[in-house]
Amino acid sequence: MYFGKTRQSDQSGRVPPNQNVTTSFPVLHTGDVPYYEDMTKWNLQVYGLVDHPMLLSFEDVKAFPRYESKNDIHCVTGWSRLDNVWQGVRACDIAEKAGVKEEAGYVILHAEEGWTTNLPLDDFLAETSLLAYAHNGEPLTPEHGFPLRGVFPHLYFWKSAKWLRGIQFTKENHPGFWERNGYHMRGDPWQNQRFTWD
């Protein structure tokens, strides 16, 4: 499934349990890869329990302060990729601009084709949480989420939704696509939270 892998024991505690390091960047998703020929037709909706709902163009997103984060990512299928450098907007900056209401406790990320995933609000607001439009200094490719994807490196990588179209703040925790199909509601790789029963 992927190449250039090494054993986790070589990585001095940087790799969670039952993971192997790869130097490639595997592409995993359901459905078709969307291609945007006209970016004026793309937008990001920020809504739910917020004081200021927003409908952001790609240029609006890029007008937020640019943030760079270097981190490791861990896929629930068993691979880890180290030293990724992402550029984008801090998730907390989006939340601050929208004015998240006190009763909000969770976030639902909406992507193309109706795909969703859920996050506790604290995970969305974490210092390392990013809405990325570039990886290692280059714009995201369509296969890796162009124009915008979530990056939540402290959780399994399925939580880092590709092809983002909406950020919804909610009071209750609603399971997303993979969570409805048996994946863990939070997905902490260091706790090996892969499936509902973990």
From Swiss-Prot:
Keywords: Metal-binding, Molybdenum, Oxidoreductase. The keyword Iron-sulfur does not apply. Residues 1-23 are annotated as: Disordered. Pfam families: Oxidored_molyb. Mo-molybdopterin binds at C75, H144, R149. Its EC number is 1.-.-.-. Residues 9-23 have a biased composition (Polar residues). Binds 1 Mo-molybdopterin (Mo-MPT) cofactor per subunit. One of its GO terms (molecular function) is oxidoreductase activity. CDD domains: arch_bact_SO_family_Moco (cd02109). It comes from the Bacteria. The keyword Metal-binding applies. Signal peptide: none annotated. Its cofactor is Mo-molybdopterin. InterPro entries: OxRdtase_Mopterin-bd_dom (IPR000572), OxRdtase_Mopterin-bd_sf (IPR036374). This is Uncharacterized oxidoreductase YuiH. It comes from Bacillus subtilis (strain 168). The lineage of its organism: Bacteria, Bacillati, Bacillota, Bacilli, Bacillales.
